[in-house]
Curated annotation (Swiss-Prot):
Residues annotated for 5-methyltetrahydropteroyltri-L-glutamate binding in this entry: R20, E21, L22, K23, K114, R517, C518, W563, E607
PANTHER family listed in its UniProt record: 5-METHYLTETRAHYDROPTEROYLTRIGLUTAMATE--HOMOCYSTEINE METHYLTRANSFERASE
GO biological process per UniProt: methionine biosynthetic process; methylation
Keywords: Amino-acid biosynthesis, Metal-binding, Methionine biosynthesis, Methyltransferase, Repeat, Transferase, Zinc
Domain of life: Bacteria
Function: Catalyzes the transfer of a methyl group from 5-methyltetrahydrofolate to homocysteine resulting in methionine formation.
Binding site for L-methionine: I433, G434, S435, E486, D601
Family in the record: Belongs to the vitamin-B12 independent methionine synthase family.
Gene assigned in the entry: metE
Binding site for L-homocysteine: I433, G434, S435, E486, D601
Protein name as annotated: 5-methyltetrahydropteroyltriglutamate--homocysteine methyltransferase
Reaction it catalyzes: 5-methyltetrahydropteroyltri-L-glutamate + L-homocysteine = tetrahydropteroyltri-L-glutamate + L-methionine
InterPro entries assigned to the protein according to its UniProt record, in alphabetical order: Cbl-indep_Met_Synth_N, Cobalamin-indep_Met_synthase, Met_Synth_C/arc, UROD/MetE-like_sf
Residues that span the membrane, as ranges: none
Length: 756
């Protein structure tokens, strides 16, 4: 059967629901408030509505199997029967799935890390020597049948074998998972046959790992694997999707295989990639010309120029997003606070689908068929270029002056001596990362302020009560360096964005970060200006309640960029320095108010690292420079902390040392302190707090378990440089879990401290 050619599609779509319906349903299931049937009903409704919406918008090929209760890599591990043995102890299949993702009282979860250079996090499959791959196609077949029954032109989407293995982790003495590639090829061939038998005309195999340097042999592997899969006797047409960058030599390798279509990212990859591969002349090129991971409206005329150029290089050209629209909010429609100019510059998920359809129509019927849409696009481009909010000469001049004079602090040893004399901390000092649980009282107060039910003064009174409660709890637990708990912050980036000029905070711009965790990234559209102190009042109030040091809590410039939708009209380095200047001014004000410890979090340092090694040195240069610009305005006696998480740190370990923070806390519990060896390898000599327990799991770790982690850390870090802290902030945990876990953490620190 010859597959029906398609002209307009998207790589994938979000699954949380336009009103975060899936978040509420899964959290209700985890808490035992609802049953499996209700969760499955919500999921089925979301799938149905998503597919219907995409088809009604004009897509003639709709991705299915992009829905997930938690994560698509975890779904693929289930499909390949590759869950670890400890998760298999759970008898119910859905509970087993969630145990692998989140853990439970008996099962430690799988690791979680960043999905390439995005703010989405995936669950890292573990491949052991005993892992025996086998096909479990129930989910993908079920969703295909659902969609076809609905009359949807459905295209199942599955993570490809190369990407699955390169993003997995070998355990228990196993080598690199990619060594198992030959075992997966026949399983994928079996899957293709089943999909064809069940009515699939096309299948999409996602291979974003091909745009990275993760494997030097990737081009040859891609050609070998897809020669075999493309030669299968019974299969749908194969569309191999690459995204997030340039597939390089892998593109030519794929083009030499029998696959029918290849997707290329023409937003984050070069426009010339396709023209350089003559073998694509017989293929469908799925051209990712609409940005799937940022919120700016597409310049339709420029995109159409790219597409027109491609027509001479491929048998067919289909229009698509550059990647899944999972990374952007659902729609601009709920954003009623947007001014007309800013609204005209933006496109969220629904608007991006419309852009794809418009461009496909222009390719089919000519530019004159979409003349009105192109005119509106041109007007938006012109409006954005001329808006005075985009440039602030005073900010730019200040940055140039500080950078020219140098942004380095004093000698680390001298700083440590000065801080020791000021703080008088015990060996193995205990602290937490920053946030404490956002209670229902906090959420109700925030909602009441938004609705006008209470005024700002009453809101601040309630938040101060929450701060006082958190300070009291920490003192009762015996922590050494305290935090104020951040009750006034809905999000560690949005809180600052709402107070800085150059940002717009959305009302409903939710995107999935991991599992049920959703974030609302602000939009950074112009030059960044700090007009007033943002945290000083809250931190000094907390400090007034205790004699112990309370950390000032700030978000670093790179993380603010990584967790925002950032302007694309100037280099990221310039924007990072503008944010860094605002944070620098805040650190100076905190110090002037008597705060002795200031934490500038950079959990996203690894996230923005370019996927190709050739581009990484320049990024790390300006990222480190922005952090130092933000933190070099304070005295030696002020202790600067930073925190990093959610990442594999190996590729940025040298940069972590170059940040020159006095204390660096790191996510380390799930990876069993591996990061400490990496730090030692680059001569890291400042203090470090490797996370001693995993806060992303509801498990309460025992005192003995934490003490064991501390002793493991002491084998790599001397006691005078070791801090004791959880992996990450505690915002998403419930108060009982937090109290029990911290009680055990402090007890473990005292136990180990006694033996130092």
């Amino acid at each position: 059967m010859t597959p029906q050619a398609f002209t307009a599609t998207v790589v994938g779509s979000p699954r949380i629901g336009p009103k975060r319906e899936l978040k509420r349903a899964t959290e209700g299931y985890w808490a035992g408030r609802t049953g499996r049937a209700e969760l499955e009903k919500v999921a089925a409704t979301l799938r149905r509505d998503t597919w219907a919406g995409l088809a009604a918008a004009g897509l003639d090929s709709v991705p299915v199997n992009t829905f997930s209760y938690y994560d698509q890599m975890l779904d693929t591990a289930v499909m390949l029967d590759a869950l670890p043995e400890r998760a298999r102890q759970v008898s119910d299949d859905l509970d087993r799935y969630f145990a692998a993702a989140r853990g439970n009282s008996d099962v430690a979860p799988l690791e979680m890390t960043k999905w390439f250079d995005t703010n989405y996090h995936y669950i890292v499959p573990e491949i052991a020597p005993t892992t025996k791959f086998a096909l479990n196609p129930d989910k993908v077949l079920s969703e295909l049948k659902e969609a076809l029954a609905q009359g949807i032109p459905a295209r199942p989407v599955v993570i490809g074998p190369i990407t699955f293995l390169l993003l997995s982790k070998g355990v228990d003495g196993a080598g690199g998972p990619i060594e198992r590639l030959e075992e997966l090829v026949p399983i994928y061939a079996e899957l293709l046959s089943l999909l064809a038998d069940n009515g699939a005309q096309w299948v999409q195999l996602d291979e974003p790992a091909l745009v990275t340097d993760m494997c030097a042999d990737a081009p040859a592997l891609a050609e070998a694997v897809y020669n075999k899969l493309g030669s299968a006797a019974n299969r749908p047409a194969i569309y191999v999707a690459t995204y997030f960058g340039d597939p390089g030599a892998s593109l030519a390798g794929l083009a030499r295989t029998p696959v029918e279509a290849i997707g290329v990212d023409l937003v984050y990859g070069p426009d010339t990639a396709v023209a350089a591969v003559p073998e694509l002349a017989g293929k469908t090129v799925v051209a990712g010309v609409v940005d799937g991971r940022n919120v700016w409206r597409t310049d339709l005329a420029a995109a159409l120029d790219k597409l027109t150029t491609l027509l001479g290089s491929a048998a067919r050209v289909a229009v698509s997003t550059s990647c899944s629209t999972l990374h952007v909010p659902y729609s601009l429609e709920p954003e009623t606070d947007l001014d007309d100019a800013l609204r005209s510059w933006l496109a969220f998920g629904r608007e991006k689908v419309a852009e794809v359809v418009t461009l496909a129509r222009a390719l089919r019927d000519g530019r004159e068929a979409v003349a009105d849409e192109i005119a509106a696009s041109n007007a938006a481009v012109a409006s954005r270029k001329s808006d005075p909010r985009l440039h602030n000469d005073r900010v730019r001049a200040r940055i140039d002056s500080i950078v020219a004079s140098g942004s380095h602090r004093g000698d680390p040893a001298q700083r440590r001596a000065s801080q020791d004399a000021r703080l008088h901390l015990p060996p193995l000092p205990t602290t937490t990362i920053g946030s404490y649980p956002q209670t229902s009282a906090i959420r109700k107060a925030r909602a009441a302020l938004r609705s006008g039910e209470i005024d700002q003064a009453e809101y601040e009174r309630r938040m101060k009560k929450e701060i006082a409660d958190v300070i009291t709890l920490q003192e009762q637990l015996g922590l050494d360096v305290l935090v104020h708990g951040e009750p006034e912050r809905n999000d560690m980036v949005q809180y600052f964005a709402e107070q800085l000029e150059g940002f717009f905070a959305t009302q409903n711009g939710w995107v999935q970060s991991y599992g049920s965790r959703c974030v609302r990234p602000p939009i950074l559209y112009g030059d960044v200006v700090r007009t007033h102190p943002m945290t000083v009042e809250w931190i000094t109030y907390a400090q007034s309640l205790t004699d112990k040091p309370v950390k000032g809590m700030l978000t670093g410039p790179v993380t603010i960029l990584a967790w925002s939708f950032v302007r694309d009209d100037q280099p990221l380095a310039d924007t990072a320095n503008q944010v860094a200047l605002a944070i620098r001014d805040e650190t100076v004000d905190l110090q002037a108010a008597g705060i002795a410890v200031i934490q500038v979090d950079e959990p996203a340092l690894r996230e923005l690292l370019p996927l190709r090694r050739a581009d990484q040195e320049e990024y790390l240069r300006w990222a480190v420079g922005a952090f130092r610009l933000a933190t070099s305005g304070v005295a030696d006696s002020t202790q600067i902390h930073t925190h990093l998480c959610y990442s594999e740190f190996g590729e940025v370990i040298g940069a972590i040392a170059d940040l020159d923070a006095d204390v660096t806390s790191l996510e380390a519990a799930r990876s069993h302190m591996e990061v400490l060896d990496d730090l030692n390898a680059v001569g890291f000599s400042n203090s470090v707090g490797p996370g001693v327990y995993d806060i992303h799991s509801p498990r309460v770790p025992s005192t003995a378990e934490i003490a064991e982690s501390l002793r493991a850390a002491l084998r790599a870090v001397p006691a005078e440089r070791l801090w004791v802290n959880p992996d990450c902030g505690l915002k998403t945990r419930n108060p009982d879990e937090v109290s029990a876990s911290l009680k055990n953490m402090v007890a473990a620190a005292h136990e180990v401290r006694a033996g130092v």
